[in-house]
Amino acid sequence: MISFNLTSIVNLVGFLAFMFLMYRLLYKPYFDMTDKRKKEVEKNLNEAEKLRLEAQLKKEELDKQLSEADEKRREILSEADEQAKSIIKAAQGEAQEQRKFILDKAEKEAEEIKESAARELQSRIVSLAVTISSMILKEQIDKKKNEELIRRAINSLKDKGEL
């Protein structure tokens, strides 16, 4: 059997006291420190993950804002393009209306000039007919004399530039 003597008991008590002191002085502070360090590392990892998620959310938000700004830019450019086309179309329509107005006015003026010239020509013809008739009536003469008078009247009118 196993025999226990006093030395063995003292050694056992000394060893247990040494283990107790080691536990209190070295192991416990070491394990406390490692637990504390482990918790600090976990805390830092959690904080880093939290910051990474926040950064990702910020990035997504900025990407969304950039996308919205780009879409707004496209809308503004499209709207500006439509306005420019509208302005050009309106200007073309206005130019077309002015062109038509000017052409109508020119046609009316030409028609008035034509009518005025026709009235003046008719007035001259009537005047000439009256002049010739009065000359013929003044001299009631034969046919030869009549033709001679008409020729003289025509030549006279040609000289004056009325015919």
From Swiss-Prot:
Q: Could you tell me the keywords of this UniProt record?
A: ATP synthesis, Cell inner membrane, Cell membrane, CF(0), Hydrogen ion transport, Ion transport, Membrane, Transmembrane, Transmembrane helix, Transport
Intracellular or extracellular location(s):
Cell inner membrane
- Transmembrane domains' residue ranges: 1-21
Q: Name the source's superkingdom.
A: Bacteria
State a single Pfam family of this protein.
Answer: ATP-synt_B
Cellular-component GO terms for this entry: plasma membrane; proton-transporting ATP synthase complex
- Indicate the principal place this protein occupies in or around the cell: membrane
For this UniProt entry, the molecular function terms from Gene Ontology, in alphabetical order, are: proton-transporting ATP synthase activity, rotational mechanism; proton-transporting ATPase activity, rotational mechanism
Topology relative to the lipid bilayer, per the entry, is: Single-pass membrane protein
Q: Which PANTHER family match?
A: ATP SYNTHASE SUBUNIT B', CHLOROPLASTIC (PTHR33445:SF2)
Similarity comment text for this entry: Belongs to the ATPase B chain family.
Q: How does it assemble?
A: F-type ATPases have 2 components, F(1) - the catalytic core - and F(0) - the membrane proton channel. F(1) has five subunits: alpha(3), beta(3), gamma(1), delta(1), epsilon(1). F(0) has three main subunits: a(1), b(2) and c(10-14). The alpha and beta chains form an alternating ring which encloses part of the gamma chain. F(1) is attached to F(0) by a central stalk formed by the gamma and epsilon chains, while a peripheral stalk is formed by the delta and b chains.
What role is this protein assigned?
F(1)F(0) ATP synthase produces ATP from ADP in the presence of a proton or sodium gradient. F-type ATPases consist of two structural domains, F(1) containing the extramembraneous catalytic core and F(0) containing the membrane proton channel, linked together by a central stalk and a peripheral stalk. During catalysis, ATP synthesis in the catalytic domain of F(1) is coupled via a rotary mechanism of the central stalk subunits to proton translocation.
State the HAMAP family in the record.
ATP_synth_b_bprime
Recorded protein name is: ATP synthase subunit b
- Its source organism is Petrotoga mobilis (strain DSM 10674 / SJ95)
Whichever gene encodes this chain, its name is atpF
